[in-house]
């Protein structure tokens, strides 16, 4: 079962209905394309999402809204709404990537964003957004188990070895 299928199963287990080919943007050129939308236990994914990785990344964030958001948060001028949006995204990043995912990519020998994204079955854009979010959350670096994960100046992982 791939990550997207796991997310669909989790949604089903939590009684969240997922509409996988919804026309969220119409035929018009839109300034800000909407890839997914959560409302009252329902998730709509845009029909133009091409890959399983794209669908999984969007679904993870929309499930984040199910678990962390309440009310209508469409208006991003509201600080409260922006905080809820950030929480939903962070939930998705932790679900799809997480610090252990970054370590897993390091252990697998991934050398660049493309390889990390492929290893984690996500898009490169999603990875970059996650790193930016983690940089804001953790600062220059964070430690977990025997590893140091640097976010500034670039993503890097080091393993602490006792001598």
Regions found by a protein language model. Name each.
Residues 1-58, 63-163:
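Active-site hotspot residues in diverse enzymes, especially metal/ion-binding acidic/histidine motifs
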